[in-house]
Amino acid sequence: MNRINILNADTANKIAAGEVVERPSSVVKELVENSLDAGAKNITIEIQNGGESLIKIIDDGSGVHPEDVEKAFNPHATSKIKDTYDIFSINTLGFRGEALPSIASIARVDFKSKTEDFDMGKELIISGGEKESLTDCSMNRGTQIEVRNLFFNVPARKKFLKTTARESALINDLVNRISLANPDVSFKLFNNNKKILNTYGNGKLIDVIRTIYGKSTAENLIYFEEHKDTASVYGFIGNDTLARASRNNQSLFVNKRYVKNRSLTVAVENAFRSFNVTGKFPFFVLFIDTYPELIDVNIHPTKSEIKFKDERFIFKLVFDAVHSAMREYVKDTFTLPEEEEKKFEALKEEVIQESLDKEISTLEKLKENINYKVSDDKRKEEIYSYNPSKDYEAKTEVNIPVDFLSKENQEESSKFNNSLENNDFKEVSAKREISYDPILIKNELKDKVSENTYDSLESSDYKCNKNEYGNSLEERIYREAKFPKLKVIGQFNKTYILAEYDSTLYLIDQHAAHEKILFEKYSSDIAKKKVEIQPLMIPLVVTLPTEDYLYYDENKEIFEKAGFKISDFGDNSIRIEEVPYFLDKLNPTELIISMINNLKKMGTGETVEVKYNKIASMSCRAAVKANDVLSILEMENLIEDLRYINDPFHCPHGRPTIIKFTSYELDKKFKRIT
């Protein structure tokens, strides 16, 4: 039988070195992190033959006390921690005391260091773990270490090294990441005496990015930032022009430590794909600052992996920060013209100053001046006919659907409807939309023609005279239009709405646009717990596979808040009794199964909010489809609803809903200009 052996120090050190020092870039990482922990502001790295022949690090840090120079190369000797309690509040990059002895056991090391308090420094030479000399030396404050002939006594490890070019590239990439994490430190990297990198150390992250990735990259970045009590997130994400087929240009730092974390990478990518469906991976430089006791960096030999005490919280924080920045970036490309935006703001201020009662009173006074004209064969209603001033061309409108008024004002609306009935208008639709023009509000609210045909509204997939998103007069007033009011000029291929504004042609994907309107409406209703439900005439019993039932059972509360009334029916069966009102025409069985499948793909670690969004995305199935013929009025109302949602520019799957071509761009296409 095999007996238990006690390994000698040399063998033990080489085994430890195999965990810490995998390749030349591992040596660079450990030594540069030591320099940073020493407070260095200028760090120079020199390598030869991919680091195999020479790795040299020079810094201007605090240095090592002369009495500690030899001690620093003993296993588990460190200045970073003292006891077990310190492990749970680590503020330094290194702390185990393994790097220097591990490196010294597999290479020839020349170590020099000097502190501010001493006139002379100390030089220690170690080869293969054996001390050769310890002498005084003359040098400036800081540390200089040379590592030569790496793996000279471990041929098994040496033969697994990549080519010189590959090892050099890995070192270059590592120094780039460390430079990003420390913009206040100047880094210089030399490869075979050729300068590869030189950062300024001025504390500006964008300058480091420009130095490493180039001017073009720096000009296509979007800054994001989010702060909570226990953590902060900030950094840059590239727009779609910087997306690539690999994740090579993704950098994640936690307390300035470069780490890899699959969950947080997915959080950034999911936020990015909400606005881009390129199928590629985004460029990003992400920083997370949090309390040391809320993370564990001691789970991997190279400290390249990290665990969070509350990973769901961090996931949501990262997702929200990136998503919000991307949304604002996209919105900025469709900004309202300055003149129209000023008029909108002026209108909003005026509405704020006037009470709602006063506004309704003003409407009552105007009823006497309203002329109605109804065609019996078309059953059309013309409300508030007027001739606008010729001097006023560019108008900003705030649309106030009557059926979304408060209870008090609904009573006024009811009186208004009765007066219409008394005038023999029996076929007038109860669903009205009154459009207010800012100039006309100031001039006793002169009125604009609004037409609708009751029959066409009832039969259309898109209820064009009912605002899909707004819920009240106040909500309608305070929402901000995200792009100008467009003039519809037609429909192309029964799929795209053509519209124009200010010498610009807009193309709107009718399905994607309606998808996003429904998605935001449903998401808002879920958040406010105001989902309108529709009972099924005949409840459906669905038998699920065991795995699917377990996922349903785990997320019961989420389905309930999303507007589904489902009860257990025994033996992995469920009974579907009620569904959200606008999903009642869809197949409930397929709907529930699809939602469960979506939740399965997400796993159990996702936040409740993300799961709600995934369920809300199913509302897209109720949207108008491609090849659906829409009237001009239906298209106008769809666009009007789109203008006021939070993000009108992308559907829930990330596809664009609206694109534009300026007159200049079209002229160039037709070669009218060069």
UniProtKB/Swiss-Prot annotation:
Span of the signal peptide: none
Biological process terms in GO annotation: mismatch repair
Superkingdom to which the source organism belongs: Bacteria
Keywords: DNA damage, DNA repair
A molecular-function term among this protein's GO annotations: ATP hydrolysis activity
One Pfam family cited in the UniProt record for this chain: HATPase_c_3
Ligase in keyword set: no
GO CC terms: mismatch repair complex
Protein family (similarity comment): Belongs to the DNA mismatch repair MutL/HexB family.
The protein, known as: DNA mismatch repair protein MutL
Organism of provenance: Clostridium perfringens (strain SM101 / Type A)
Gene this chain is encoded by: mutL
